[in-house]
Design a protein with these regions (language model features):
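Non-heme Fe(II)/2-oxoglutarate
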Residues: 2-3, 38, 42-49, 164-167, ...
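Short, glycine/small-residue-enriched coil/turn segments at secondary-structure junctions
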Residues: 124-132
Length: 235
């Protein structure tokens, strides 16, 4: 499938409807529904606070994610389908990571603007080099829209200076809600974004869980990966 790398570099994202067949979607949905929880954010208690806890029942969370499920044939099949596009984004120098599910439960009000690896680290937070160091590829397993809490991104944000402490404090929420774009897709649609693009899961008002499979791709330059390993070890 064709991917416009120049468009991604200019806008920070791309959307590809109907990426998977209905059979592939069904296999991923079934796998997601039977995947154990690795970690998630619980519903707010009486004090209004949430907690990040592992291994609870899926309904105990606003949103949760599974363990890496790459050992399953259907996940590897999807990764293989993405490889030609990732190859163009990274000029052949990349590693596929991830292969886990992200689920947002109904009535979740979760929104958190952030960057992904490696740009979540201060070392690369405002790195605007030409080389793409990280890309996320997401597969919608339910209808993605403003009702279900489909992933929202802020186009062009990967080329502007932002600071994590400001995002954490919600200082860019108004801009994000005003100028952001929701990834509107039917099940089986794919979206991808430069990992430096500001994005967030959104509140789920659909009445049912909203499921996503996410696959991180990283630039495989040896020096960069060594530096990233050093940064990750500090977390």
């Amino acid at each position: 499938m064709y991917i416009d790398v120049d468009y991604i570099k200019a806008n920070g994202y791309a959307v590809m409807p109907n990426f998977l067949t209905s059979n592939e979607v069904k296999q991923l949905q079934d796998l997601c529904d039977n995947s154990p929880v690795a970690m998630g954010e619980t519903w707010a208690g009486e004090d209004g606070k949430t907690e990040y806890l592992p291994d609870l029942d899926p309904n105990a969370y606003m949103h949760w994610w599974s363990y890496n499920m790459s050992e399953h044939a259907i996940v590897q099949q999807v990764k293989d389908k993405i490889k030609p596009m990732a190859d163009k984004c990274f000029n052949g120098e990349f590693e596929q990571l991830g292969g886990d599910f992200k689920v947002t439960n109904p009535n979740s009000g979760y929104m958190y603007c952030h960057f992904d690896t490696p740009y979540r680290h201060d070392r690369w937070a405002n790195d605007f080099g030409e080389d793409i160091k990280g890309m996320q590829f997401g597969i919608a397993l339910d209808k993605f829209d403003d009702v279900s809490g489909g992933t929202r991104i802020l186009p062009g944000s990967h080329k502007k200076i932002y600071h994590k402490e400001d995002m954490d404090a919600g200082k860019h929420n108004e801009e994000f809600l005003r100028d952001g774009v929701t990834m509107e897709l039917e099940p089986g649609g794919l979206f991808c974004y430069h990992s430096r693009t500001m994005h967030s899961t959104m509140p789920n008002k659909s009445g049912k869980p909203r499921r996503l499979m996410l696959l991180l791709h990283l630039w495989n330059d040896p020096t960069f990966r060594q530096e990233l390993q050093q940064e990750e070890s500090k977390c």
